[in-house]
Amino acid sequence: WGCQREGCLRGKWGYHDVGAAGVVHMIGGFFALAVVINLGARIGRFNPDGSANAIVGHSMPMSVVGLMLIIVGFFGFLGGCIIYSSGAQWINIYGQPTTLSAFAFNTLMGFAGGLIGAYLTSREPYWMMSGGLVGIISVAPGLDLYHPGLAYLIGMGVAAVAPLVNNLLLKFRLDDAVGAFAVHGFGGFAGLVISGIFLSGYPNMNGMAEISFMGQLGGAVVMASLGFIPGYAVSWALKKAGVLRVPAHAEERGLDLTEVPAQAYPEWSGIYGEPVKAKPVMIAESKAAV
């Protein structure tokens, strides 16, 4: 519907999403939101008064490196959204002329703006790097048409709001462990709506409807529905079958110990996962050993 030049959203509404902010990210983000609703929060995530406790990952440097690898992959993913035709011309997925440099540089500008925007509102390294993803996703619909400066500002603005969206989910006791909805769902939705503002009136090829705000907004609603409705139905069915989440004891010990079983860090844990108490070394003993 939205990825091909003959798609109904493209032909009738002028839907423009060359970087798949809706077709990929919104569908995945809203699917994740639906699953989170049925899955419920992790043990210990919320207090009786509704306040949230932080459950952080085991290594912030590893998390940041992982996010950087995802961002590097985005340049390949988005670069794959354009085609080099036999006539020595780059075209986007809709058959319109574009350039590889436009995609690459606007991706970089969205990433840079996203880093700054998310850091300004969160002051957290994890959300700063996640903001880079939000920035790229938010400019994805118009990578072929945006000015680089505009791409930077869009990425910064949307990424600044993303941590606040995740905090809003916590108010409703929705535990999105990695911020999938705030990054992909909200980032894709905001990107499509904003592209409808700045790209409204741009013509399409072969007599198709021109890009419009209502077309982009309508396309965003369609993509949200295509993600949320199946996600809710599938997760609800799995919940009723009793297989949506692991038992409480497995959640507390970790799946590495209960399912594999294997220990990620055996040097720091006993055979049943209890922390090993380190033997204190006296200064005199350490000197004697030397």
State each model region's role.
Residues 1-290:
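Hydrophobic alpha-helical transmembrane bundles of multi-pass membrane proteins
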